[in-house]
From Swiss-Prot:
Pfam families: MTS. Belongs to the methyltransferase superfamily. RlmG family. Keywords: Cytoplasm, Methyltransferase, rRNA processing, S-adenosyl-L-methionine, Transferase. PANTHER family: RIBOSOMAL RNA LARGE SUBUNIT METHYLTRANSFERASE G (PTHR47816:SF5), RIBOSOMAL RNA SMALL SUBUNIT METHYLTRANSFERASE C (PTHR47816). Signal peptide: none annotated. The lineage of its organism: Bacteria, Pseudomonadati, Pseudomonadota, Gammaproteobacteria, Alteromonadales. CDD domains: AdoMet_MTases. The gene is rlmG. This is Ribosomal RNA large subunit methyltransferase G. Transmembrane segments: none annotated.
Length: 421
């Protein structure tokens, strides 16, 4: 894996997050290089700048290398992006006191004089981001968007003009181009969240713009809903929850359970929270918070005493533009560490991804629950702490520190910090 970022005299060491990913993926692409090169070539100086969709901090670190006092506002929907950017700034000994992080769902602050963006894979999300910018950018503000040349076409430029202002693309460099958009100062209405029904499960679903399966039930979730695990589960995690539909149905099937929704996407977590409220699934017989919502890199920051007895998982195999299985690996490893002894990991995935090999290696067991021509549902049970793989022993072994049957009292507000008073 290449870790040395070098462009126009700027030298950085950049890693993806988590840094244990496979070696053929790097923490930046040529579009990051092109944006930095463009700023240096045009002798851009320190002005109030927003950076949006900076995957692992290449743009942020680049600007701070030019001027450590550069005032930057960073917006990302991915927790791994936030953690990766923070990691790379520390690795390169760059300051963070001029940085402001903003929520992908809240209003943007005023006063930006320049915006740098990476084109996201999800164009509905991109349109939403442009709409948000139209609320805070005065006429004449430059927005520079880096993208692969093959992703830039007439339709994309028209989308930018419709949602923010006139746009034109640079010449190609390293198979990338920089789009320059000039804000026209007109405020666009923000798109409304998509709401749709799943009548066979009596659920209403709301999706924000960066959530997978925008207006319909995806095929993997469908087969999972039809094949929920059997048992008496009291603490259930919907890991990589998306809009939360698996956790919502789990509450229908196991009404005495407490459900915990976790995703790397802040918009996904917000959608799951909205859907919990929309479907009114609280059981009056239970006390405390019956659902918690965590914006997290898998189960990285869950409190150490948390021991669910069921984890539902529909792993993504993309991280941005990259196709990778490291997310599934991390989900399975985190599930093994966190599950109580006897706990179940219930997974759906494309057949060709061969998740059964990973689960067998980690859990020492794997059962096929259901399958069709494209998808398979697999189940693995944590039956012994001794099943820990040698490479896992190099990391923090929570199983050696805690009794795997330790229960955490409800409410579960302690999962992401101190309990509420």
């Amino acid at each position: 894996m290449t870790t040395q970022f070098s462009v126009s005299g700027i030298e950085l060491e950049l890693l993806r997050y988590p840094s244990r990913q496979e070696s053929n993926l790097q923490a930046w692409d040529a579009a990051d290089e092109h944006l930095i090169k463009h700023l240096i070539d045009t002798e851009q100086t320190n002005i109030n700048t927003a950076i949006i969709n900076d995957n692992f901090g290449a743009l942020t670190a680049g600007l701070l290398s030019i001027d450590p006092s550069w005032a930057l506002t960073l917006e990302t929907d991915a927790k791994t992006s936030l953690l990766g950017t923070t990691q790379n700034l520390s690795r390169n000994q760059l300051p963070t006191d001029t940085l402001t992080w903003v929520n992908s769902c809240d209003e943007l602050p005023q006063g930006f004089e320049l915006v740098l963006m990476k084109l996201p894979k999800n164009l509905n999300y991109f349109s939403h981001q442009l709409n948000r910018l139209s609320h805070v950018l005065p006429a004449g503000t430059r927005v520079l968007i880096g993208a692969k040349a093959k992703s830039i076409n007439k339709s994309l430029l028209e989308t930018i003009e419709k949602n923010l202002g006139a746009a034109s693309a640079s010449l190609t460099w390293k198979k990338t181009r920089v789009i320059t958009c000039i804000s026209d100062g007109k405020v666009r209405p923000l798109p409304k969240a998509t709401t749709w029904s799943v009548p066979e499960f009596k659920l209403q679903i709301t999706n924000l713009s960066n959530v997978f399966a925008a207006n319909k039930l995806d095929i993997g979730a469908r087969i999972m809903l039809d094949n929920m695990p059997k048992g008496d589960f009291k603490s259930i995690v919907d890991l990589g929850c998306g809009n939360g539909i698996l956790g919502l149905h789990a509450k229908q099937v196991f009404p005495e359970a407490y459900i915990h929704f976790i995703d790397d996407s802040e918009m996904a977590v917000a959608s799951a929270r909205e859907n919990w409220a929309l479907n009114k699934l609280d059981n009056p017989a239970l006390v405390g918070e019956q659902a918690t919502f965590g914006w997290d890199d898998c189960l990285t920051h869950m409190s150490e005493g948390f021991r669910p007895d069921l984890i539902l998982c529909n792993p993504p195999f993309h991280q941005g533009e990259a196709i990778t299985d490291h997310i599934a690996w991390q989900m399975f490893l985190d599930a093994f560490r966190r599950l109580k002894n006897g706990g179940i990991l219930h997974v759906v995935g494309n057949r060709h991804l061969a998740y059964h090999v990973k689960l067998q290696r980690i859990f020492k067991n794997c059962t096929t629950v259901a399958s069709n021509g494209k998808f398979v549902i697999l189940q693995a049970q944590k039956i012994s702490k001794k099943a820990l793989e040698p490479e896992l022993e190099q990391e923090s072994d929570l199983n050696s520190k805690l009794d795997a049957n330790t229960e955490v009292p409800h409410p579960q507000s302690a999962l992401y910090g101190k309990p509420k008073a």
